[in-house]
């Protein structure tokens, strides 16, 4: 009987380690206006996020680090969707420009780690009105991976 408990305990630990993450909450989108009215995007600078972990290979522990700048992820996805990314706000294009603000809005802890929730806010450059917001969680091997996954999920939900 003692052996059965050990096997069940080992199985439970293995499953929790290999699953690595909790089920992520669905991404949400709140649309106030049509985003297709805009063709240009200005994304204010964001700070690079660094994350590190360790990987065990053949009994050796190897450090692994990763960094991501949320602005780069947002710009990559939006440029792929056909938006023109501006390095600065230009008065000539204000009526067709949307400003995208990034923010970490929550952190949810669970047994083996946490998720990071990000919110992206789309604001009209000409009127200052809120066009839409999108929020999503991310959970990866590092904080940088969490943020990258969350931003990607939020934008994917927006363009669904």
Q: What annotation goes with each model-predicted range?
A:
Residues 1-21:
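Sec-dependent bacterial lipoprotein signal peptides
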Residues 10, 32, 109-111:
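Residues embedded in well-ordered secondary-structure elements
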Residues 16, 36, 94-95:
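Structured loop/turn residues at beta-strand edges in well-structured enzyme cores
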Residues 19-81:
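A structural "domain/chain start" motif
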Residues 26-27, 72-145, 149-152:
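Surface-exposed short loop/turn segments
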Residues 153-160:
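C-terminal alpha-helix
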């Amino acid at each position: 009987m003692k052996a059965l408990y050990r096997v069940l305990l080992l199985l439970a630990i293995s499953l929790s380690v290999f699953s690595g993450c909790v089920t992520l909450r669905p991404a949400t989108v709140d649309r106030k206006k049509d985003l297709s009215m805009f063709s240009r995007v200005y994304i204010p600078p964001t700070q690079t996020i660094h994350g590190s972990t360790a990987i065990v290979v053949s009994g050796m522990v190897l450090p692994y680090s990763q960094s991501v700048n949320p602005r780069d992820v947002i710009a990559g996805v939006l440029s792929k969707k056909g938006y023109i990314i501006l390095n600065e706000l230009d008065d000539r294009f204000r009526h067709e420009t949307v400003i995208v603000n990034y923010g970490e809005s929550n952190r949810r802890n669970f047994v083996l780690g946490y998720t990071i929730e990000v919110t992206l806010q789309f604001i009209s450059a000409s009127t200052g009105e809120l066009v839409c917001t999108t929020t999503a969680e991310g959970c990866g091997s590092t904080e940088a991976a969490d943020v990258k996954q969350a931003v990607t999920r939020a934008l994917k939900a927006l363009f669904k």
